Structures are given as structure tokens and as C-alpha cells.
């Protein structure tokens, strides 16, 4: 029973780390990366559709993304969706392909992005700690039901704390890498 709780907690903490990593990937750096456009929704035949379902996003060079739209009739909708996103991008149309030059980030904008990334990291840490709290409370319920001993609870708390620290360290490493990436000119 305790082993199941521990395994579940580890899986949930791993998912928290992945979710934090994915959220940080959406924060724009000076480099072109297809995941920058993942959050964009396009009005395609009256329904909001993710951009990656109506177009192929690729990297042309370090500061340019290319978006190849599958259906030529949707080019205007894709262009409008990219322009109206809060990313500050201006696509240039070239047939069925949109070229999106990424403007260089100002120092002020970089610092704003670092604040956003730090907030994401803190959110990840809090989520990991919440998983730890939930796991420990489940084991304490088992102790009250006389299904495990107080020593088992203490041992479990120590083990959970160790892998909580390990997962928080992973989040901190991801944060440090993202901060370095953001400060590169």
C-alpha cells in the first residue's frame, strides 16, 4: 500500500516537472523554435483549431520561423491568428508559406521573460510540494487505520522528501538553463 502511494507520488512529481518544462518552452527566447506557436488557435471553418493541425511549423534560420499552411484558403486565418497572439510577431506571406522573423529581444523584455519563467518554476515547485503533502497525508490515514506503523510513516516521509528534493532540483536546473538561454544576445 505504501509502495503504491510512493510510486504514484513519484509519477505525479515527474508530471509536474514535465508540465513546468513545457510551460517554460513556450516563453520566447531570441531563437526561433516551433513550440513558440504551439498555443496559437486558428479559426478554421468556424472552429478554433490548434495551429499545428492546419499548418507545419519549421525553422528557416536562427531568427525565422516558416509556417506552411496545408489549405491555401486558411492562410489569412493563420496570419491573423499569429498577429493577434500576444507574441508580438508579424508574419510575411509568401504563397502557401508564412515567414515569421523574430525581432531581437530588448534587455527589458528579457527581464520580463525571466520573471515569467521564475514564476513558472515556483508554480512547479509548489505543485511538487503539494504532491508530497498529499502522499504523506494518505500514509497518515493508513497509520490511523492501523494499517502501518509510526516507523513506516517516518521512513516514508524521509523517502518522499528525498525524491521531492530531487524533482525540485530538476525544476531549478531547467530554470537555470532557461535563464541562460534568455540572457544570450
UniProtKB/Swiss-Prot annotation:
Q: Answer yes or no on keyword Protein biosynthesis.
A: yes
Name the major location. cytoplasm
| InterPro entries for this protein | Ribosome_recyc_fac, Ribosome_recyc_fac_dom, RRF_sf
Which GO molecular function terms does the record list? ribosomal large subunit binding
Query: Where is this gene product found?
Result: Cytoplasm
An example GO biological process term is: cytoplasmic translational termination
**What SUPFAM superfamilies does UniProt report for this protein, alphabetically?**
Ribosome recycling factor, RRF
Keyword Cytoplasm present in the record's keywords: the answer is yes
The alphabetical list of record keywords is:
Cytoplasm, Protein biosynthesis
GO cellular component: a single term: cytosol
Which family, according to the similarity comment? Belongs to the RRF family.
Function text:
Responsible for the release of ribosomes from messenger RNA at the termination of protein biosynthesis. May increase the efficiency of translation by recycling ribosomes from one round of translation to another.
Among NCBIfam families, the record links this protein to: frr (TIGR00496)
- What's the name of the protein? Ribosome-recycling factor
> What is the originating organism of this protein?
Shewanella sp. (strain ANA-3)
Amino acid at each position: 500500500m505504501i509502495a503504491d502511494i510512493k510510486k504514484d507520488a513519484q509519477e505525479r512529481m515527474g508530471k509536474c516537472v514535465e508540465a513546468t518544462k513545457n510551460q517554460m518552452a513556450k516563453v520566447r527566447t531570441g531563437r526561433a523554435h516551433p513550440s513558440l506557436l504551439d498555443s496559437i488557435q486558428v479559426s478554421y471553418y468556424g472552429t478554433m483549431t490548434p495551429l499545428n493541425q492546419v499548418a507545419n511549423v519549421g525553422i528557416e534560420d536562427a531568427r525565422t520561423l516558416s509556417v506552411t499552411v496545408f489549405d491555401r484558403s486558411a492562410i489569412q486565418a493563420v496570419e491573423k491568428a499569429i498577429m493577434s497572439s500576444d507574441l508580438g510577431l508579424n508574419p510575411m506571406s509568401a504563397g502557401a508559406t508564412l515567414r515569421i522573423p523574430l525581432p531581437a529581444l530588448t534587455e527589458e523584455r528579457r527581464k520580463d521573460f525571466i520573471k515569467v519563467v521564475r514564476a513558472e518554476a515556483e508554480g512547479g515547485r509548489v505543485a511538487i510540494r503539494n504532491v508530497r503533502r498529499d502522499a504523506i497525508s494518505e500514509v497518515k490515514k493508513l497509520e490511523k487505520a492501523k494499517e502501518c506503523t509510526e516507523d513506516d510513516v517516518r521512513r516514508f516521509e524521509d523517502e518522499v522528501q528525498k525524491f521531492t528534493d530531487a524533482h525540485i532540483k530538476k525544476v531549478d536546473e531547467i530554470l537555470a538553463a532557461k535563464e541562460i538561454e534568455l540572457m544570450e544576445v
